[in-house]
Structures are given as C-alpha cells and as structure tokens.
Curated annotation (Swiss-Prot):
It is an enzyme of class 3 (hydrolase). Its EC number is 3.1.1.4. Snake venom phospholipase A2 (PLA2) that exhibits weak enzymatic activity. PLA2 catalyzes the calcium-dependent hydrolysis of the 2-acyl groups in 3-sn-phosphoglycerides. This is Phospholipase A2 II-5b. Its cofactor is Ca(2+). The lineage of its organism: Eukaryota, Metazoa, Chordata, Craniata, Vertebrata. Expressed by the venom gland. Keywords: Calcium, Hydrolase, Lipid degradation, Lipid metabolism, Secreted. It comes from the Eukaryota. GO terms for molecular function: phospholipase A2 activity. It catalyses: a 1,2-diacyl-sn-glycero-3-phosphocholine + H2O = a 1-acyl-sn-glycero-3-phosphocholine + a fatty acid + H(+). Belongs to the phospholipase A2 family. Group I subfamily.
C-alpha cells in the first residue's frame, strides 16, 4: 500500500511532508 508506505516514511523522518 503506497499510502501506508508514505506514512511509515513520514514517521521515520520527522518534519517531512507527507508524499500523499
């Protein structure tokens, strides 16, 4: 799931903007 993946990245990188 791309949305789940982007959520993980968003949590892993603080201050990063959500991809979706």
């Amino acid at each position: 799931n791309l949305i789940q993946l982007s959520n993980m990245i968003k949590c892993a990188i603080p201050g990063s903007q959500p991809l979706f």
